[in-house]
């Protein structure tokens, strides 16, 4: 029992390597003047992501487009890998998500204080704050700034883990109810299918939300 619980927190390195290789396999570089449907879908998807993530940026902020697109595709594909049978999503590991959130957040903070020092400091004190509240507001805003990478990682971990656990519990209940009644099996099976579809949507939405928040942090500093 203890070994099973400890195995839950093991990082699946093999799955991560598969996730890293997936973009190169699924999103090949076009080498023909007239592309096929798969390349057309790829280009449409990338343009859609760029439009959603980079619409708020100026020309200087557009230099981050490749990083944001890569981040979105990596997290999305990693989340989807966790839905395969006998697999485990690396994004359910808080350490994996922190290893992405902390460097990206640190980069946005460093850029902000380097290129927009006054504006970055002004974010710590909202305009119109009463004088007697200034020390407390500065402390609150500083804490809010420092916990950004933690909230990024915890949000992604919690959403992916909750969905996987819900599917696992519902699937276990379906196996238990196999010998009870045919109608019960049918209802449970439909529930599992609906939860799986919902988890597919959550996997893609959480990848988008993670990249969108990084894009907003970059917008404040770039």
Curated annotation (Swiss-Prot):
GO CC term (a single one): proton-transporting ATP synthase complex
Localization: Mitochondrion inner membrane
Catalytic activity, reaction form: H(+)(in) = H(+)(out)
The keyword Transport appears for this protein: yes
Membrane topology: Multi-pass membrane protein
Taxonomic superkingdom: Eukaryota
Residue intervals passing through the bilayer: 7-27, 64-84, 93-113, 132-152, 160-180, 197-219
InterPro entries tied to this protein: ATP_synth_F0_asu (IPR000568), ATP_synth_F0_asu_AS (IPR023011), ATP_synth_F0_asu_bact/mt (IPR045083), F0_ATP_A_sf (IPR035908)
Leader sequence residues: none
Principal localisation: mitochondrion
Pfam assignment, any one: ATP-synt_A
GO BP terms, alphabetized: proton motive force-driven ATP synthesis; proton transmembrane transport
Keyword list, A-Z: ATP synthesis, CF(0), Hydrogen ion transport, Ion transport, Membrane, Mitochondrion, Mitochondrion inner membrane, Transmembrane, Transmembrane helix, Transport
GO molecular function: proton channel activity; proton-transporting ATP synthase activity, rotational mechanism
Family annotation (PANTHER family): ATP SYNTHASE SUBUNIT A
Protein's job: Subunit a, of the mitochondrial membrane ATP synthase complex (F(1)F(0) ATP synthase or Complex V) that produces ATP from ADP in the presence of a proton gradient across the membrane which is generated by electron transport complexes of the respiratory chain. ATP synthase complex consist of a soluble F(1) head domain - the catalytic core - and a membrane F(1) domain - the membrane proton channel. These two domains are linked by a central stalk rotating inside the F(1) region and a stationary peripheral stalk.
Family: Belongs to the ATPase A chain family.
Oligomeric and partner information: Component of the ATP synthase complex composed at least of ATP5F1A/subunit alpha, ATP5F1B/subunit beta, ATP5MC1/subunit c (homooctomer), MT-ATP6/subunit a, MT-ATP8/subunit 8, ATP5ME/subunit e, ATP5MF/subunit f, ATP5MG/subunit g, ATP5MK/subunit k, ATP5MJ/subunit j, ATP5F1C/subunit gamma, ATP5F1D/subunit delta, ATP5F1E/subunit epsilon, ATP5PF/subunit F6, ATP5PB/subunit b, ATP5PD/subunit d, ATP5PO/subunit OSCP.
Name of the molecule in the record: ATP synthase F(0) complex subunit a
């Amino acid at each position: 029992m203890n070994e099973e619980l400890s195995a839950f927190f093991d990082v699946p390195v093999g799955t991560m390597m598969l996730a890293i290789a997936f973009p190169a396999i699924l999103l090949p570089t076009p080498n023909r003047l007239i592309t096929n449907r798969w390349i057309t879908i790829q280009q449409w998807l990338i343009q859609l992501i760029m439009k959603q993530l980079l619409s708020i940026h100026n020309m200087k902020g557009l230099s981050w487009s490749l990083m944001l697109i890569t981040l979105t595709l990596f997290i999305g594909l990693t989340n989807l890998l966790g839905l395969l049978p006998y697999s485990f999503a690396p994004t359910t590991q808080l350490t994996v998500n922190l290893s992405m959130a902390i460097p990206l957040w640190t980069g946005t903070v460093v850029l902000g204080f380097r290129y927009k020092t006054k504006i970055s400091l002004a974010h710590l004190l909202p305009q119109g704050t009463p004088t007697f509240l200034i020390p407390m507001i500065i402390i609150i805003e500083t804490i809010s700034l420092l916990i950004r990478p933690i909230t990024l990682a915890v949000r992604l971990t919690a959403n992916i883990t909750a969905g996987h656990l819900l599917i696992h519990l519902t699937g276990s209940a379906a196996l238990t109810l196999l010998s009870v009644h045919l109608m019960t099996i049918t209802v449970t099976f439909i529930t599992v299918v609906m939860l799986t579809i919902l988890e597919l949507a959550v996997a893609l939405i959480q990848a988008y939300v993670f990249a969108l928040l990084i894009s907003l942090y970059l917008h404040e500093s770039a």
